[in-house]
A protein has these predicted regions:
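Outer-membrane beta-barrel "beta-signal"
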Residues: 314-316, 328, 347-363
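Transmembrane beta-strands of outer-membrane beta-barrel proteins
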Residues: 24-32, 70, 74-78, 111, ...
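Detector for outer-membrane/organellar transmembrane beta-barrel domains
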Residues: 189-309, 313-314, 327-328
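Transmembrane beta-strands of outer-membrane beta-barrel pores
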Residues: 32-38, 80-84, 117-119, 161, ...
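Outer membrane beta-barrel
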Residues: 22-37, 47-171, 194, 202-207
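Extracellular loop and loop/strand-boundary signature of outer-membrane beta-barrel proteins
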Residues: 45-48, 88, 138-140, 183-188, ...
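Structural signature of outer-membrane beta-barrel channels/translocons
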Residues: 63-67, 105-107, 156-160, 203-207, ...
Length: 363
């Protein structure tokens, strides 16, 4: 009898370890399309090409969760971006360039450490009509909307309809090119501000209403010509959405930027505003139509480029959809907003029209 009691006590002591629940999930997105652009180079020539990561960046990843008991979980994410048209790694060739972090999660929130998305990316993806796609979306006018920072400590809390995010990056991993080689900035002894970043934001979503506000700050990086650690870029973004029943959704947002990273002495700061507006309509159970407009107000030059986007998305199955995007970017003087972003496949001062037909599969 005594031996049975001892055995039962021993089993009870180890059972939390023996029966801890854990899981590992392999997931990803394969997104490819054919795109036509005019005014794609300095000679004004057009371009037809196969592209990767259009509505969603092509990626694969591993997501792991372990139940530690008492409502606490350990977790990790390793996510790698790739170019489906060539097979090469994205994000500068990093193995896990999209995300790589480990953390703990409790009912009071999640604390995660590693390379992660900034608060702009986490929150604004729900308020861009084109969901921050790699092309033909809000990130055309500011690539920081899809920013990722190395060396980050991040808190995420969910409290009913409210989500709160606060993060600090010891060095966000800016690319540095020297002698033909590319490296990524890290922490610098004696200068903790080099390449530093911090960000915070909240989201409120209840019923048909959604709204968000975010602050993001980046410091200059040692090792890059024209930068120093006293320089900084500050962004504030606010956005909202409203659902009309089950068929329509309205989006609107604003981004303020003031900064001097990379600005030469005596030159004006990088002061600009971004405004966007869009509407998505579920015309059929499998077919949705989206229209969006993005306006970049450049306070330094007054060149103020803008773009208009139209998109149709047809769901083929639970995991596969086809899309058609049409876009127009308007420039004046030597502004260079293209449908893939500033200075990307666009001739300065010219307007650009683009069409893309693509296929996306999620696994």
């Amino acid at each position: 009898m005594k031996e049975k009691l001892i055995a039962a006590a021993a089993l009870a002591a180890i059972s939390p370890l023996a029966f801890a629940q854990s899981s590992v999930t392999l997931y990803g997105v394969a997104d490819a399309g054919v795109e036509y652009l005019n005014h794609a180079n300095a000679s004004g020539n057009s371009l037809t090409r196969l592209t990767s990561g259009n509505m969603s960046g092509s990626r694969w990843g591993l997501r792991g969760v372990e139940d530690l008991g008492a409502g606490t979980k350990a977790l990790y994410v390793l996510e790698s971006g790739f170019e489906i048209d060539t097979g090469v790694a994205s994000q500068g060739g990093r193995l896990f360039g999209r995300q790589a972090y480990v953390g703990l999660e409790h009912r009071m929130g999640r604390l995660s450490l590693g390379r992660q998305q900034n608060a702009l990316y986490d929150l604004l993806i729900n308020y861009d009509p084109m969901v921050l796609g790699a092309r033909y979306s809000l990130q055309m006018v500011d690539s920081s909307f899809v920013g990722r920072y190395d060396n980050m400590a991040k808190y995420t809390g969910k409290f009913g309809p409210v989500t709160a995010i606060a993060l600090y990056s010891f060095a966000r991993g800016t690319s540095i090119t020297s002698g033909g080689a590319t490296s990524f900035a890290g922490e610098v002894p004696g200068d903790p501000k080099s390449d530093q970043a911090l960000s915070a934001g909240f989201d409120y979503s209840s019923g048909p209403v959604g709204m968000t506000a975010i602050y993001d700050q980046q410091q200059g990086t040692l090792g890059i010509t024209g930068q120093n650690t006293s320089q900084r870029d500050r962004r504030i973004a606010v956005a909202g959405s409203f659902k009309f029943g089950t068929t329509g959704k309205l989006f609107a947002g604003y981004r303020w930027l003031n900064g001097d990273i990379g600005v030469l002495a005596g030159q004006p700061s990088k002061r600009s505003d971004v405004y966007w507006l869009g509407y998505q309509y579920q015309i059929l159970p499998a077919l949705s139509l989206t229209a969006a407009g993005y306006y970049f107000n450049d306070k330094r030059t007054g060149r103020d480029p803008w773009s208009l986007i139209g998109s149709a998305n047809y769901v083929l199955s639970k995991r596969t959809d086809a899309f058609l995007n049409v876009g127009y970017a308007r420039n004046k003087e030597d502004s260079n907003l293209g449908l893939n972003g500033f200075g990307i496949s666009i001739t300065p001062g010219n307007n650009q029209t683009g069409v893309m037909l693509g296929l996306r599969h999620k696994f």
